[in-house]
Amino acid sequence: MPTIPAGQRVWLLELPWGGLGGGMPAGVTYYKSLTAHAYVGTYLPEALEPYSSKAYSSLRWQEDELNGTEGPGATAAPMTLRPEQRADVEAITAAADRGFRQVHLANDVGTGKTLVAVAAAKAIARARGARTILVTVDRPARITIPSWRRTIAALNSTDGVDDELRWIIMSSDSLGKLMARNGRPRLKVDVAVIDEAHQFRHASKRTSYMRRLTRMDAPHETAPFVLTITATPGHHPGEWGYMSSLYAQVHGDPPARWADFGRALADRGVPLEPSYGKWTWSAEAKDSLQTQQAAISDVRDILLRHDPPLMLTRSAPWGPPPFDVDLVELTPDQWRAYELEWGDFQREMQLARTGKNVARGLAALVRLRQKASMIRVEHTVAAAKAELARGYQVLIATEMVTTAAHPVAEMLEADGIPVARIYGSNPDAEAERMRFQRGEAPVVVFNTPTAINLQAGEQFADGTYATDTPRRGFFHQARYSGLLAEQTMGRAHRNHQICAWSLLAAAGTIEERAGTVMLSRLIASATSTDADASTFSEVARVFGIDWIPAARLADELG
């Protein structure tokens, strides 16, 4: 363990293996017991600042423990809960006040579950005098962790108080870092938020870690409060094992009696049977969709119809497509590559400005966006793969071909994922569209914003239908035109089919600024047609420009 002299502190660092530039920076030591690099001193050298621990990370938690004081938290523009979100928070806290150990939040994509979860966790922790809140998130961690960090910081800003809560955000794949060598948790969790809880529907190492960290086998009265979140809990009730202790509590049983969740349900008449170490529908249920739906309803309603409700569901309203922004945090190496390109851009732009060469300036801007797009391809691919694992078909919208559409498609196909390509001058665009619509290719990469249908359930000319698999959309690059952005989202968000969209952008780069322009245009176009701009107002808060009235933005963009 590092020795910390009086008047100094330790910084734990996220350094790549082998150090920087092939060597270890001066003053940095790797500590096997911490599985981290550390620097001890009175201040952190500027060259090491990009590698310092992030707020609410497990590395920061270790760092705070070593120093005996807490490092700075994150900051973000305040967020305000909508009335229905406040109602959900009140329902969750009411269940906690009644002594229930868990609530499951199953609202649709785009309804603001993250904001609800953070607000509810804060309220429950305050009421209980608790301190430590664990949040587990799904892949890709470089998108999901920053998103949760921003939401926590935003609500801290809204409250305007320091509640001294200790948040730890972990990807489900990293939960082992919170376990000691004896297999026990290294910290006592008071409140846990398990996002995308369907990750834990099967027996696995990470499921075992989650169960131990949340003390699922502990008596109900001593267990931490757990909020599980997913709109897609599993293919059948036998996969809802992450709620086993809650079902035990509702039935007045000890948790151990429901630890084998599939067995407990089967013993109570749910049509399940074991198969290759897992539970699945019985032969009778496999032949009857009605039997399956009835069984799901019966098991779900135990929580949904309970007083107080222990499962919350809220459908996404028809109207504007659910739209949010995911700002990706580049790795230090990616940042270095970006900053080199940024320096080249500034020099080129200065020459263009001096010579009043508009074409040269625009060309420099395009090159920078191309480079920024290339750096982030792997993040878009990771986001798409995560949504495929959740049961969606994925749309990826791009503007550029050689530095966006093509590399994204190539990387997905290299991982064995078929991709429909609707970009460039592809003469087989319709055949590619049909590959996606019929489910032969679960991903479509396209830059055609109009005149194509990509929604679920489309009826074809021959009377057959597209797959009913829900769609999920990503903008790999921001669209400067609000109309084109709306039309792009409308490729799958149409005909009573909901398709949530996210803009992926690298935080602190030209892409983030492009996203601000895109957001402004979207608000302007929505306002000009008297549409509901509330969805896009949520995104404005991410960028910290929610102080600009939508109508004023529309006037300025006139």
Task: Give, region by region, the residue ranges found by the protein language model.
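Conserved RecA-like P-loop NTPase helicase motor core
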Residues: 171, 413, 418-515, 521
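Walker A/P-loop
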Residues: 99-120
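Accessory DNA-engaging acidic/polar modules
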Residues: 1-74
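Conserved Walker A/P-loop ATP-binding site and its immediately adjacent core
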Residues: 114-121, 129-153, 233-239, 399-405
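Conserved RecA-like ASCE ATPase "motif II neighborhood" in helicase/translocase motors
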Residues: 165-218, 447-451, 456-458, 464
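Conserved pre-motif I regulatory segment
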Residues: 65-104
